Amino acid sequence: MLKIRVMPTLLSDGTKLIKGVGFDSWRGIGSPLQAVRLFNMRGVDELVFLDIRATDERRSPNFELIDGLADSCFVPFAVGGGVKSVEDARGLLLAGADKVVVNSAAVENPPLVAAMVKQFGSQCVVVSIDVRNGKNVTIHSGKKETDKNVVEFAKEMEKAGAGELLITSVERDGTMQGYDIPLIRSIADAVSIPVIASGGAGTYEHMAQALRDGGASAVAASSMYHFTGQTPLLAKRYLHDHGFQVREQWGQDAPHAR
C-alpha cells in the first residue's frame, strides 16, 4: 500500500494569503513566506500554493513570489493560479515549483494538459477540479459553472496524462464540516491516478473518512490549520494510529492525536 499524503493548501490573491468559505467571504490571513516556513517545520508531505485571483485578473503567475517561496520550501511544492500555457508552467517550474496545478485552463483549453505532460511529464501536472452540487465542474474560482460532469471530466484529464487530481467541493470549502465523501469516492472509483481530497476538512477523522471511505490518496486542508490548533504532524500521527501508512516524521515523544 502506498503511503498517504497530508498537504496544507495555501490560497493567495497574488501577494498575501487569503481564506474564505464556499469560495466567498475572503479575508487576509497572513504572509505566504511565513506560512511556507512554518509548514516546512510541521511535517507536511507536500505543500499546495494557489493564486486564486490570477486567472480572473488575467495575470500570469507571480514567478518572483514563487521563486522566493521555493527557496524556503523543502518538501514537494505544487503551484497553480494563472496557468494558461506551457510557458506559464515552465516559468513556475523554473521558479522552483515541483508540480504545476492547472484549473480553469484545463476546461477552456483542453489540449493544454496533454501539452504540459508532453513537455514536463505526468508527475509534474496536477489538474484541480472545483465541483458544485457534487457533480458540476466550475471554473474561475467557482464563479462560472460549466456543463461538464465531474466524473467524465476527471476521466478526460486522466486520459490527457494528468498525474493526479485535486478535487474541491465548493460548498464544503472552509466549512470544516467534512469532505464530500460521495464526490471523492465517485472520482476515485473512476480513475487510476491519485485523487487529493479538498474542501471541508475540520478534524483528523474527516481526513480518515476521505481516505478510508472516499478512496483518496491524499488529503488537503486549509482552514483547520489556519484557524484551529490542529497541525499536519498531528494529523499524520492520528492517521498512523488509525491504520494508515504515512511518512513518519515525528520523534518518539510526539503526542498522539485524539
Name what the model sees in each region.
Residues 46-65, 104, 109, 166-178:
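Glycine-rich, proline-tolerant flexible connector loops at the mouths of alpha/beta enzymes
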Residues 60-67, 110, 143-152, 177-186:
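Charged helix-capping and loop-helix junction motifs
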